Every structure is written in C-alpha cells, then in structure tokens.
C-alpha cells in the first residue's frame, strides 16, 4: 500500500448520520461570526462526514467504537491551511475566542493523540505539503509537515539522490509532522536514528499565533534545545509549520543475514555485544519464540534475528562481520536470508488488526525502551503479566530498535473478552494495558519508545515521569495559558472540564 492521503482505520457499522461521540465533553458552540472569520482565512468545512473523518486515528480501542456506531469525539469544523500565515491566523483567532485546536495529518497514530477531545477546530495539515528546498552539499531538506512518507522519499531519491532514512510501519499513511509530533522511530533506526536525530530545525506556530524558528544549525549551545521541546509534544505546545531534516546519500549497497537462537537471552547478548562494539546495522530485529514461529521460520523454541545493513560496501562488510561474530559466539545458527526478504515484503501489513477486531478480539501493541541490563526481565515480566488477565490469549515481543545502552521491546497482545459487548471489550482492553504498562514501569522500562502518549497512555505519564511531569505541565501553561492546543493530552489537566465516556 502506497498512499499520499490519510487512510481510515476501519469502517463504521452505521451510516455517518447515525454515528455518536464516545467522549462526552462540554464545549460552547462556535458562532456564525467565528466560522465566517475562519473561512476568510482558508478553506474550512463543517460537513458532518468531513468532521467525523478528520476526528479519527488508528487507536485500536477506537476501532471497536467504530464497529459500534461511535467515534471518539467529532470536531466542530475542519480547516485546510496552505501557508504558515494561515496557521498563524487560525491559531490567533482560536486563542481570542478560546476555541480548542487539534492538528491532523495522516491520522495513523495508535494512542488517540489526534482525537479532538473537546471538539473545536481540527487543522488538516495535508494541504501544507511538499519539499521546499534541498541543500545537497549539507544534506539539509526543507519540507512542509503535511508531506507523506512516500512523497518525501520519492522526491529526494529521484531529484537529489538522498534519503532521510525514516521508515516507520506507518510510512505510507503518515506525515513528516506526525513523525515529529509523536517522536517516532523508523525500522532503519539502528543506523539512522529516531526522528529526534533527523530533525535539524523547526518553524513553530505558538498558541498566540506568533511564529518561531528553532534553528537549523548542526549543533548549538545557546541554552536548551527548543527543537527538542516540540519533538514529541503531540501538538500540545505549538503547531509545526515547517521542518528541516537531515538526509543521507542513497546507499549504494545492501547486505542481509538471518540467524536462529536457542534462547532469547543468547540473542539479546549477541545484539548487545555487536551494538556496543560499534556495529549499527540499519535493521537488527529479534523475535521471541512465539513471533518467530508465527512469521519468521521458527519452530516454537527458536528466536529469529534479522539483520540488514546498507551503505558503502567497506562499511557494510565490517558491520555484518561484527554481528556475525557475536551471533556465532552466542550459539546462533545462520539461516536463509529469505527470512529478511519476507519481512521486507510484509513489514507494514496491519490487516490482522482489523480482521481480529471485527471478530471481537482485543488486539494491540505496546513499545517501551529499556537498558540492556533489564531487557530480559522486562520482556518476560510484561508477557507474564499480560497472560494473567482474564481472556488473554497471546503475548509476544520483539526487539525493534537498538542503542548503545539499550533497546526497544515491542509487545503484541491478543485477548478474547468475556462477551462481544462494547463494555466487555473496554474492560478487557483496559485490564491488559494496565497489566502491561505497569509491569513495564515496575521493571525499569519507560512509558513509550515511539508510539507516544495520546489518550491511551495519559493515565500513566505522571507515574512514568514523576515530578518531571510538573515541569512539563509548567511549560504547557507558559506556552498555552488558554489551553487551546490539543487539550487533555500528555496527562495535562484541562481547564475545559471533565472528560466522560458515553455509557
């Protein structure tokens, strides 16, 4: 699938006119004069179908709501700016009228971050798209935030021989702004880094409509990094209106390898030693016994490790040699590289999510980052915790991203609720998430590696960050005193009232 537009997660079980809101929040109706002023600034729409479409993302729980003729919360109006000036004017107008704003791009997030909890204005950023300029000497790309992954990469590769190297599972249906807002990671991150490492600078519209540039230099020491402040802020501190990304020459060569280990711990040790020796292949993915059997050639007792690197031949040879040495030293057997080919061909497939949801199963994923010394404990503890929940049918994991000091563990779980009612589904979903996230935090993992917080994880963030969350909340209040930017997210208390769910 290659698209350059948002892709709906799942169909509704009823006509759009019959859809109701799951979240019940109180907001004042938008006045006719406000809507008229908005339409003067840029194209806007309060068409019902438009409002429903732009108020969704890929949060798995919300898919069950869709199958029960509900959406999370509809926006009141959709705006489609095409310039920074448009965004600035929209924000200033909303600030003066205390109207909440939620930014929308590809709407591929899985935690509900793009859902407008308090209605108001949704700004559709997908008309603000395209590569503006490329500094080929420095490898610096100026791009608009509504640009979809395929459009960015195709432009850079075909016209400039460059690649950003950011390939998340949502690559085909997500945008540059979304990558930054959620602090995402691509599947080649062990070589190229997370989106944090790729962003050189940002243009940001603040909550009063003013516009700032955070800088585009390769490094700096003029106080804390303002660029970093907005990466991962999920549209709650400012609206990203322009981006400068670091790009690399297209890799001239590629190499692949696959291994099977008799134990997850042996494979983790091989990965750790390879990474700490300086080997950073673009892809280094380890699957536990269950996931290896399901999709990667294992027999139920083996763990598959898939390796792919790209770049100059001399560098690839060195990287792959280090990885091979550590794998063999830790009791691995070499496998057919066709396993890597299979993964490459199916890595972005999400069809199982929709299929199982339609059958009434609860299915979701949870990713956390953890130091090497705790990887095995976190992996085992979280899976065991999930399986203690009533109705849990499967808990598995893989390591998807690696660093000098640790890795990302990506869990997948499936549960069968006690009945196919929405109430039973929600009880099952919440129970598994509580078990999984709390056990991860208990054993030393963080809250999230790259999916972000949104609505789903908001209840855990204060525990995860501790007093540091108060600092984050103080920044939010300083930048957005009227609480208009994506209110109710990142665990921030909203001045707009209580968030209730329809029963």
Where are these regions (language model features)?
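N-terminal flexible segment immediately upstream of the FAD-binding catalytic core
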Residues: 1-92, 109-138, 289-298, 339-363, ...
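C-terminal substrate-recognition/cap domain of FAD-linked oxidoreductases
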Residues: 8-9, 46-65, 249, 255-263, ...
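Alpha-helix capping/hinge segments and adjacent helical runs
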Residues: 40, 44, 48, 441-453, ...
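Short, ordered loop/turn segments at secondary-structure junctions
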Residues: 105-108, 169, 286-289, 452
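FAD-binding subdomain of flavoenzyme oxidoreductases
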Residues: 130-285, 484-485, 500-503
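Activity-critical C-terminal alpha-helical subdomain
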Residues: 210, 454-503
């Amino acid at each position: 699938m290659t698209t350059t537009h948002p892709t709906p997660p799942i169909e509704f079980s009823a006509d759009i006119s019959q859809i109701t809101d799951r979240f019940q929040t109180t907001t004042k109706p938008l006045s006719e004069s406000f809507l008229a002023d908005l339409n003067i600034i840029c194209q806007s729409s309060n068409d019902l179908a438009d409002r429903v479409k732009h108020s969704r993302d890929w949060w798995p729980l919300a898919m069950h709501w869709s199958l029960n003729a509900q959406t999370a919360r509809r926006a009141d109006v959709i705006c489609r700016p095409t310039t920074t000036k448009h965004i600035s004017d929209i924000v200033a107008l909303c600030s003066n009228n205390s109207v909440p704003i939620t930014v929308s791009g590809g709407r591929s997030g899985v935690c509900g971050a793009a859902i407008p909890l308090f209605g108001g204005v949704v700004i559709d950023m997908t008309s603000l798209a395209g590569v503006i300029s490329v500094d080929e000497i420095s490898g610096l790309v100026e791009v608009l935030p509504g640009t979809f992954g395929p459009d960015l990469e195709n432009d850079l590769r075909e016209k400039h021989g460059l690649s950003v190297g950011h390939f998340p599972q949502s690559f085909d249906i997500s945008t540059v702004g979304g990558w930054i807002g959620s602090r995402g990671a691509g599947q080649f991150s062990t070589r190229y880094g997370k989106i944090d490492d790729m962003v050189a600078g940002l243009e940001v519209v603040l909550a009063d409509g003013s516009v700032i540039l955070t800088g585009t230099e390769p490094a700096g020491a003029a106080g804390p990094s303002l660029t970093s402040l907005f990466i991962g802020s999920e549209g709650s501190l400012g609206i990203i209106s322009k981006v400068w990304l670091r790009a690399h020459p297209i890799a001239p060569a590629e190499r692949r390898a696959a291994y099977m280990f008799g134990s997850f711990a042996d494979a983790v040790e091989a990965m750790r030693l390879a990474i700490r020796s300086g080997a950073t292949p673009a892809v280094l993915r380890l699957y536990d016994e269950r996931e290896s059997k399901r999709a990667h050639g294992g027999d139920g007792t083996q763990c598959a490790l898939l390796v792919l690197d790209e770049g100059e031949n001399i560098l690839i040879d060195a990287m792959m040699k280090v990885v091979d040495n550590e794998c063999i030293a830790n009791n691995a057997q070499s496998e057919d590289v066709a396993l890597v080919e299979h993964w490459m061909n199916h890595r972005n497939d999400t069809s199982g999510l929709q299929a199982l949801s339609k059958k009434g199963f609860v299915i979701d994923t949870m990713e956390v980052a953890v130091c090497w010394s705790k990887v095995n404990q976190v992996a085992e503890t979280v899976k065991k915790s999930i399986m203690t929940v009533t109705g849990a049918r499967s808990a598995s994991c893989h390591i998807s991203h690696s660093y000098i000091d640790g890795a990302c563990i990506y869990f997948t779980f499936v549960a069968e609720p006690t009945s196919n009612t929405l109430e039973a589904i929600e009880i099952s979903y919440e129970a598994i998430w509580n078990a999984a996230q709390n056990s991860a935090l208990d054993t030393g993992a963080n809250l999230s590696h790259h999916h972000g917080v949104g609505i789903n994880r908001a209840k855990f963030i204060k525990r995860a960050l501790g007093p540091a969350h108060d600092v984050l909340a103080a920044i939010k209040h300083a930048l957005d005193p009227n609480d208009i930017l994506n209110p109710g997210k990142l665990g921030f208390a909203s001045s707009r009232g209580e968030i209730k769910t329809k029963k």
